[in-house]
Regions:
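N-terminal amphipathic alpha-helix/helix-capping segment at the start of soluble metabolic enzymes
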Residues: 43-64
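Short gly/pro/ser/thr-enriched loop/turn and capping motifs at secondary-structure boundaries
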Residues: 96-98, 151-153, 278-283
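C-terminal alpha-helical cap/extension of soluble enzyme domains
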Residues: 257-328
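Short, Lys/Arg-enriched N-terminal segments with co-localized hydrophobic residues
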Residues: 11-14, 20-43
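Alpha/beta enzyme core
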Residues: 49-53, 71-91, 95, 105-116, ...
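Hydrophobic faces of well-ordered beta-strands that scaffold small-molecule active sites
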Residues: 62-67, 88-91, 120-125, 144-146, ...
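Alpha-helix boundary/capping motif
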Residues: 2-7, 16
Length: 328
């Protein structure tokens, strides 16, 4: 079977060879493996987060970004997105990547996107340096985050701008972080004892000087498991929304009451990250099955229960973010 030119966007034919190579890397245009002889079909390829988040910003909803740990997580999150007809972002942290590598996770999520009826983006969460982000670009990730929040304001700007410039050249959006989201993200340093809020004036300057396409802000949330009642400072969300025009991102959302998250979305949050509670849900389902079936040695059986727990949780989160039906 030959690949028809109708499977490829018109602008692709007029690009330089270098730009075509970049476009292939980002959008992964390919033929459908299930197409019969003589049939022409285009895969639902991975998409970037740029249009996804701009649509959310215009429509006053948020896209859920879910950290995936393995194939079961990918399949479970996609099942929820399909059922709710929601756009979805799957993301991996450097800590998760250490278990297999960028290419393994890219392969899994790319395969999921090709079978999906909803938009799927693959995002590098908390990119821990310029080199890591370049590796993600080269692998085919369609969105990256550079986390310079532990640096000084000026050093964060310099680092973020270097990655944002590279992302712009490759057509890949770049998320940055300004302010301190508390707790500990995977293998990253713990953040304690600092102001949890991003300054709106600094946010405006930061976005203008770096060219980042979305911004994760500190509004009182924390990574990991909360040891006290979480609280989102909605006035900070509103002030930053008024100060910048790029989509805003909320980290450390696992365990935050739904009503607080929903209000933050109404106030301008466009992307909401979830990680810890997916791990908890999967482990809950897996361990419950093993407790009832201690002689089981087929990992697919307890994994199925873990996947079911994730799917149900993600459906609830997507409903709360008001993203249901936005992929139709």
């Amino acid at each position: 079977m030959t690949i028809s030119r109708t499977c490829i966007p018109a602008e692709f034919h007029t690009m330089s060879a270098a730009k075509r190579k970049v476009k292939r890397l980002v959008n992964n245009y390919a033929r459908c493996p299930d197409a019969g002889e003589g049939e022409e079909q285009t895969l639902m390829a991975l998409v970037t987060t740029e249009k996804m988040l701009k649509d959310a910003q215009a429509g006053h909803y948020a896209v859920g970004a879910f950290n995936v740990e393995n194939l079961e997580f990918v399949m479970a999150v996609l099942a929820a997105a399909e059922e709710t007809k929601s756009p979805v972002i799957m993301q991996t942290t450097p800590g998760t990547i250490k278990t297999a590598g960028l290419d393994y996770f890219y392969g899994m999520v790319k395969a999921a996107a090709e079978r999906a009826s909803v938009p799927v983006a693959l995002h590098l969460d908390h990119g821990d340096g310029y080199d890591r982000c370049m590796q993600a670009f080269r692998t085919g990730y369609t969105s990256v985050m550079i986390d310079g929040s532990h640096e000084s304001f000026e050093d964060n700007i310099a680092l973020t701008k270097s990655v944002a410039d590279a992302g712009r050249a490759m057509g890949v959006p770049v998320e940055a972080e300004l302010g301190k989201v508390g707790g500990k993200e995977d293998d990253g340093p713990a953040v304690e004892g600092e102001s949890p809020y991003t300054d709106p004036a600094e946010a405006k300057e930061f976005v203008e000087r770096t060219g980042c396409t979305s911004l994760a802000i500190g509004v009182g949330t924390s990574h990991g498991v909360y040891t006290s009642d979480p609280h989102i400072e909605q006035s900070v969300v509103k002030a930053i929304r008024d100060a910048v025009d790029v989509p805003l991102v909320l980290h450390g959302t696992s365990g935050v009451p739904d009503e607080q998250v929903a209000e933050a979305v109404k106030n301008g949050i466009c992307k909401v990250n979830y990680a810890t509670e997916l791990r908890q849900a999967y482990t809950k389902g897996f361990m419950a099955y093993m407790a009832e079936n201690p002689a089981c040695f087929d990992p697919k059986k307890p994994a199925k229960e873990g996947m079911r727990e994730i799917t149900e949780l993600v459906k609830i989160r997507m409903t709360n973010l008001n993203s249901v039906g936005k992929a139709e």
